[in-house]
Each structure stands twice: as C-alpha cells, then as structure tokens.
C-alpha cells in the first residue's frame, strides 16, 4: 500500500504548528476542579527513570517506593491517584525536587504532539478542564500558527505526497467548518462527504486526483446533495448506537460508567427497551421532543453553542486527521470527530434534563473534558473508536452509496 513506506532515518529542519490559543494556557494547579494525576497510568520516560535512580536526600525513599520500576510507571492508590499526588492535588515530587524532576508526560500535559516528517504539530488537549474552558470560551475561528526551528532532528520517513494532500484536505475541511454563513449541520455534512470521497481515492491509490474532490464540494449542486442527505430521519438510531458503543471502551474513571447509564436513561428511556414496540416508539417521540426543546433553549440562553461545537470539531480534526498518513484511514478520523461532538451534545442534553432544563457553562466544560479523558487518554479506546467508525458508517454512506464508491458525482 502506498502510504505504508519503509521507515528511514532522515535529518531536516522542523516546522512547528500551534493553535492561536496555545500560549493562553497556564496550569492552575491546586485550583483546578479536577486533577491530571489520577485515573490514568503515567508512564515515565527512560531519561527520567535514570534520573530518579540517582536521587539522594530525604525524598529518595518516597521516590523509590512510589515507582513501579519494572513497568516504568508511577504507582497509584486505590482511587487511581498518582502516588506523588497529595490531598491538595499538588505534586510532592515537584515540591521536593522542582520542575526539572518531572517526567516527559507530566511536563508535556496537556500539550499533545503529532510528528509528521519535518513538521511537529502541537495542540492542547481538551481533557484538561482549563484548556476546555479556553477553547469553549473562544468566539473567533481558531487559526494555526507556523514557525521554523533551526534545530535539526531525526524523524521517520513516510509518504510525503499523501501527507501534503492530507494537509490540503484538512485545511479545506477546517475552512468549511469555520464558514459561519452555512448552518453547522451542512458544514459537517460537507466535511464528511469530502472525507468519504478522499478515502475512496486513497483506497484506489488515486492520490493525484484528490484535488478534484475539493473542487466537487465547492459547487451549489454538492451543497444541495448534502442537504438532502441531512434531511433523512435516521439520526436517532445511529446516535443511540454510537452512545452505547461507549460501554465497549475501557473505563479510566470509576464514575464514568454510572454517568453514562444515567444519561442513557434520561435520553432514551428504558435502557434495554424491553417494553413493547409502542413503548419504544414513545421513548423516541419523547427524545425528539426533548431535543427540539433543548435546541430552542440553547438558541435562547446559549446562542454560541454552535461556535463551541465548531471549535471542538476543528480540535479533533486538526489533532488526528493527518495521522492517516500512517494508516490510510482518513474517513474514520473525520467520523470520529463528528461522532465525538454528537456524543458530547447527547451528554449535554442529558445534563440539561437532569438539571430540570437548564445548563451552565461549567456543565459544558465538565462534559467536554470528561469525555475527552475517557477517549484520548487511552490508546485502546482511540483504536476501538476508529474500528467502530469503520464498522458503523453514517447511513448515507451505505445502501445505494457503497462505501467503496464516491458520493453522487456532481
């Protein structure tokens, strides 16, 4: 396959890209409503482990007994809190040994890095409440800044032509997502259609004609085609299935499972829907009514909610889409972004119902960062999500539109 190349070592100057809000972040430490030092396994890098073995002084014993040296991880207590995390949610290692003592994971988080040939893309993860607060509070479309480093580094070689086309595609998709003259669902539909047809060409090994896909979806006929697809009433079954897929994932926080069960009951009624077909129909009708009222409420009391969803879509696509250069899976990464925002919307609807039909900005931040932690802090969960996206295509990419065929040729 053309996108799986022999990996070679090369040296070249690097370009760095960051979102324009990157430098707005500053850790608020003990003032944070949550902690990044619990609920997931912190793996220390080799350099940090070597440094820890050489530590002397009063903190040495604590350090030695708090690390699983065989696995290279920090131990956790019964509540999955890091062994170095104190009751004030501050790091005792940082206090005793200073910032330079931190391992790479702890120094970097919530910064996330994706490596592409001579480009290093740096983002901030919305699994951090403070990052979620910054992004969701941002009204202007996100811009991406690029600068060059004189420092030469080694990287693994890959298919530069496919990567360049993926970068072009990502820019086109982000431009569409940020075109606020169009309704958000239309923007999302256009982006999904582009990603679908892009995937078909990657599968055909027809990378040279990818630019034709971009041109096709600039036409009014393409817009009308996508609008017609969006009007099909199959969203309920799809989103319900996507919601239940979350139970297949590993749990990083013990409270996430009960949270999902409560939300599902509020959204869809009886969880097993073991009642009659008539009762299940009533659940669907109630869901539709609740969703309509929720959208009316959002338009009145949270009119910027579509901007927040736009920012999240741009976040997920900017972070993960170009990773398709390594596995050729462009479409599933876009559907994962869309499904993630759909699930966040469902969780917010459930929270709105639980709050007796009201919602605060803190509810939005809480939902976003908790969802992100469960998905993005687990490689198995990210891999499973992509697998599920391959299995469960949006309905209008099936039936008459076989997944190996392009959308209606405009």
Regions found by a protein language model. Give the residues of each.
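Single conserved hydrophobic/aromatic residue that forms the stacking wall/gate
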Residues: 1-11
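Ferredoxin-type iron-sulfur electron-transfer modules and their immediate structural context
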Residues: 12-35, 59
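Short linear interaction motifs
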Residues: 17-18, 87, 324-327
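Short, charged/polar micro-motifs that form catalytic or ligand-binding hotspots
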Residues: 22, 27, 96, 159, ...
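Local cysteine-cluster metal-coordination motifs and their immediate loop/turn environment
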Residues: 24-42, 77-112, 125-132
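Membrane helical hairpin/interfacial module
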Residues: 40-88
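Internal, well-ordered alpha/beta segment that forms a basic, Gly-enriched binding/recognition surface
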Residues: 89, 97-192
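Hydrophobic, aromatic-lined core segments that form the binding pocket/scaffold
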Residues: 183-410
């Amino acid at each position: 396959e053309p996108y799986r190349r022999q990996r070679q070592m090369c040296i070249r100057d690097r370009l760095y890209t960051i979102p324009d809000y990157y430098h707005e972040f500053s850790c608020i430490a003990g003032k944070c409503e949550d902690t990044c030092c619990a609920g997931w396994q912190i793996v220390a890098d080799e350099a940090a482990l070597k440094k820890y073995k050489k530590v002397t002084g009063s903190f040495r014993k604590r350090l030695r007994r708090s690390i699983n040296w065989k696995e290279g991880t920090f131990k956790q207590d019964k509540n999955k809190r890091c062994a170095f995390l104190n009751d004030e949610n501050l790091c005792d290692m940082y206090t005793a040994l200073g910032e330079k003592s931190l391992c790479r994971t702890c120094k970097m988080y919530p910064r996330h890095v994706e490596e592409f040939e001579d480009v290093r893309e740096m983002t901030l993860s919305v699994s951090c409440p403070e990052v979620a607060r910054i992004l969701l509070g941002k009204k202007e479309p996100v811009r991406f800044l690029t600068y060059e480093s004189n420092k030469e580094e080694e990287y693994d070689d890959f298919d530069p032509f496919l990567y360049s086309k993926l970068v072009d595609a990502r820019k086109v998709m982000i431009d569409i997502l940020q075109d606020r003259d169009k309704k958000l669902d239309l923007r999302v539909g256009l982006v999904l259609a582009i990603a679908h047809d892009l995937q078909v060409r990657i599968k055909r090994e027809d990378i040279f004609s990818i630019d034709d896909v971009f041109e096709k979806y600039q036409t009014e006929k393409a817009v009308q085609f996508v609008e017609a697809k969006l009007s099909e009433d199959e969203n309920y079954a799809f989103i319900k299935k996507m919601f239940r897929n979350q139970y297949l994932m590993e749990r990083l926080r013990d409270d996430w499972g009960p949270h999902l069960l409560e939300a599902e009951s509020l959204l869809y009624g009886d969880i097993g829907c073991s009642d009659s077909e008539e009762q299940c129909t009533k659940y669907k009708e109630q869901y539709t009514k609740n969703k309509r009222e929720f959208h009316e409420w959002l338009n009145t009391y949270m009119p910027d909610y579509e901007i927040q969803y736009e920012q999240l879509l741009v976040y997920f696509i900017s972070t993960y889409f170009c990773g398709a250069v390594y596995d050729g899976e462009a479409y599933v990464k876009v559907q994962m972004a869309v499904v993630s925002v759909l699930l966040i919307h469902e969780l917010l609807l459930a929270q709105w119902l639980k709050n007796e039909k009201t919602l605060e900005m803190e509810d939005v931040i809480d939902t976003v960062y908790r969802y992100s932690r469960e998905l993005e802090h687990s490689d198995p969960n990210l891999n499973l999500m992509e697998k599920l996206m391959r299995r469960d295509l949006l309905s209008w990419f099936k039936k008459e539109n076989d997944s190996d065929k392009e959308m209606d040729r405009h």
